[in-house]
Amino acid sequence: MKLVFLFLLVTIPICCYASGSGCSILDEVIRGTINSTVTLHDYMKLVKPYVHDHFTANAVKQFKQCFLDQTNKTVENVGVMTEAIFNSESCQQPS
């Protein structure tokens, strides 16, 4: 599960700023992914503009389900890790 999330972060082209990724759409999707109160149905509505076939839809459902199956502590740690990445020295907005 943690490896899957790492691969997701590696494949996303990230333009980082001091708070969040710098892309409100990406931030919203990440928040929806790690928020255990967002149901699978609501999550699919959130990502619908970016899912163009049933193969991708199935992968996205499985990905969200991985987060729904995790403990609150694990999901909280993913949020901390995401913020640490976005706020890291190598991800700072140029002055």
UniProtKB/Swiss-Prot annotation:
Pfam families (UniProt xref): Uteroglobin
GO biological process, one term: androgen receptor signaling pathway
Annotated keywords: Glycoprotein, Lipid-binding, Secreted, Signal, Steroid-binding
Tissue and organ expression note: Expressed at very low level in ventral prostate.
Disulfide bonds listed in the record: none
Glycosylation site residues: N35, N72
GO molecular function terms noted in the UniProt entry: steroid binding
The keyword Coiled coil appears for this protein: no
GO cellular component, one term: extracellular space
UniProt entry tagged with the keyword Signal: yes
Signal peptide residue numbers: 1-18
Highest taxon listed in the record's lineage: Eukaryota
Predominant location: secreted
Localization in the cell: Secreted
Expression induction: By testosterone.
Quaternary context: Prostatein is composed of three different peptides called C1, C2 and C3. These form covalent C1:C3 (F) and C2:C3 (S) heterodimers whose non-covalent association forms tetrameric (C1:C3/C3:C2) prostatein molecules.
Family note: Belongs to the secretoglobin family. Lipophilin subfamily.
Protein role: Part of prostatein which is the major secretory glycoprotein of ventral prostate gland. Steroid-binding protein; can bind non-polar steroids, cholesterol and a group of small proline-rich peptides.
Protein name: Secretoglobin family 2A member 1
Organism: Rattus norvegicus (Rat)
Gene (UniProt): Scgb2a1
